[in-house]
Regions:
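Active-site histidine-anchored catalytic micro-motif
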Residues: 3-262, 266, 277-283, 296-303
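Acidic/polar loop patches that form or flank catalytic/metal-binding clefts of enzymes
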Residues: 268-273
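Short hydrophobic/aromatic beta-strand or adjacent loop that forms the aromatic wall/cage
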Residues: 289-294
Length: 303
């Protein structure tokens, strides 16, 4: 590869999980943004869903409709890996110069992950361009990022694998803290934690509440999910780690949520559950469904 060749993260889910036609995609984004809830405080971070845009768009829009696009120079997205088994307790990162969207490119930031971490964190960063490029839990945010910021921000992406201990959570939080402090700084960086919530039904191998009346099952799932969302919003990372370690869950982004919760706790961010819903509200109701939540984090300090 020549030194001038750009490393481009190609959009693999356009025309599949969201419209690949720019004008239609703009109309779709406008619709979701018009349905978003107004949030008076300065947003610093968010936990958001990543399903196909017809499902996740409402949850994503609650954050993007309330972001000051002039306030940030950097966006970092942490997501789970759905397609590649990753080594645990490490941060799997990319080195792309640009991220493709139907609305135009988003500048990358390959230098963000490259410098060797300080002593004690060496070896915690693993190059994973291939896994990153095929991950919908990252790409589904690109249209909103491009629509909101244009080319004003630089985008960095990481996949979070299983985290085996609180020590591992804290170590990767140390690493992220160091990266951001050496980059744009906290006040100019917006963090997105990518996760859907409970996947319920035989197709997902998860039916702890049986196959009883659908409404009753949905209410029990919602109660469990809201407990998780509350612990994340309040920075109760040890409670979350205990919950995820001791009980079965199909929250696909539980490890990014753990890492984000620790990070936001350190920064003094406070979260609120802005929206909770499931796929049955957006299509034919079935016994199998996926739940989604948007949790918005704020601080009193302006970005």
């Amino acid at each position: 590869m020549s030194t001038t060749e750009l490393r481009v993260n190609r959009a693999k889910f356009a025309s599949r999980w969201y419209s690949g036609k720019p004008e239609q995609l703009k109309r779709d984004l406008h619709h979701y943004l018009s349905e978003a809830k107004e949030y008076p405080s300065v947003l610093r971070a968010a936990i958001l869903p990543h399903a196909g845009l017809s499902y996740s768009g409402y949850g994503m829009a609650d954050a993007f409709a309330n972001i000051d696009p002039q306030g940030y120079r950097k966006v970092v997205i942490l997501a789970p890996s759905h397609y590649v088994a990753l080594a645990p307790d490490l941060l799997h990162v990319e080195e792309f110069d640009s991220h493709e969207t139907p609305l135009g490119p988003i500048p990358g930031d390959p230098e963000f992950w490259t410098p060797e971490p300080r002593e004690g964190l060496a070896g915690a960063l693993v190059p994973a361009n291939g896994a990153v490029e095929m991950e919908h839990a990252l790409e589904l945010f690109f249209p909103f990022v491009r629509n909101t910021f244009g080319e004003r921000v630089r985008l960095s992406l990481a996949l979070v694998p299983p985290l085996s201990s609180m020590d591992a959570v804290e170590r990767l939080a140390d690493l992220l803290q160091e990266r951001v402090e050496r980059g744009a700084g906290w006040q100019k960086t917006f963090f997105i934690i990518s996760s859907d919530f409970t996947h319920y039904g035989r197709r997902f191998g998860y039916t702890p509440f049986g196959r009883g009346p659908r409404k009753e099952v949905e209410e029990k799932v919602a109660a469990s999910d809201v407990e998780v969302a509350t612990e994340a919003a309040e920075g109760r990372v040890k409670d979350l780690f205990r919950r995820f370690s001791e009980s079965e869950t199909t929250i696909c982004g539980r490890y990014p949520i753990l890492l984000g919760t620790e990070l936001f706790r350190r920064l003094g961010f406070r979260g609120d559950l802005a929206r909770y819903y499931n796929s049955n509200l957006l299509g034919p109701a079935t016994e199998e469904f996926v739940s989604y939540a948007s949790i918005l984090f704020t601080s009193q300090e302006a970005p």
